[in-house]
Design a protein with these regions (language model features):
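Acetyl-CoA-dependent GNAT
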Residues: 5-84, 95-97, 101, 105
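Short acidic N-proximal helix/loop "leader" segments that mark the beginning
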Residues: 1-3
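Positions that flank functional sites
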Residues: 41, 117, 140
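Flexible, glycine-rich phosphate/dinucleotide-binding loops
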Residues: 73, 119, 139
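Conserved glycine-rich acetyl-CoA-binding loop
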Residues: 82-96, 105, 109, 116-123, ...
Length: 140
């Protein structure tokens, strides 16, 4: 199987190996440490706006997790891609799929948080029409 984005499942449904892989991805990409329970209990419903990037060995190399935050808004809970897959269009593919899915279900807004020092992510979101609405001092 080639590298591709696949529909994701709720973290509650993932096996321990997948949880460990996701924890390592979060650590590598954000510096944040999560417990198995904190990953498993993230509010991620099963819908076609949630994706995982699987490599040719069926290993998780990225994820875009979003939840239906309100009747009009989708909130990005996590968006992380392994460094070996960054800058190759994988993030854009996932983003476009999630946006199309959200619009198709009537959502009008997307909300997310990003670290102020994550220039790569900020540029990624700005290139897709996102703008900074508020800065949360001391959040990270």
């Amino acid at each position: 199987m080639p590298v591709e984005w696949c529909l994701g499942v709720s973290p509650k449904s993932l096996d321990e190996f997948s949880i460990e892989t996701i924890k390592q991805l979060f650590l590598d990409q954000t510096g944040e440490v999560y417990s198995n329970q904190s990953v498993r209990h993230l509010p991620i419903p099963e819908w076609d706006g949630n994706l995982v990037l699987l490599d040719e060995n069926n290993m998780i190399r990225g994820l875009l997790w979003a939840n239906k935050f309100s009747a009009t808004r989708v909130r990005i809970v996590a968006f992380a891609i392994d460094s070996d897959y960054k800058g190759k269009g994988w993030g854009a593919k996932a983003w476009n799929h999630m946006v199309d899915s959200a619009r198709g279900q009537g959502f009008k807004e997307i909300q997310l948080e990003v670290r102020g020092d994550n220039e790569f992510a900020i540029e990624f979101y700005r290139n897709r029409g996102m703008e900074i609405i508020q800065t949360l001092e001391g959040y990270y």
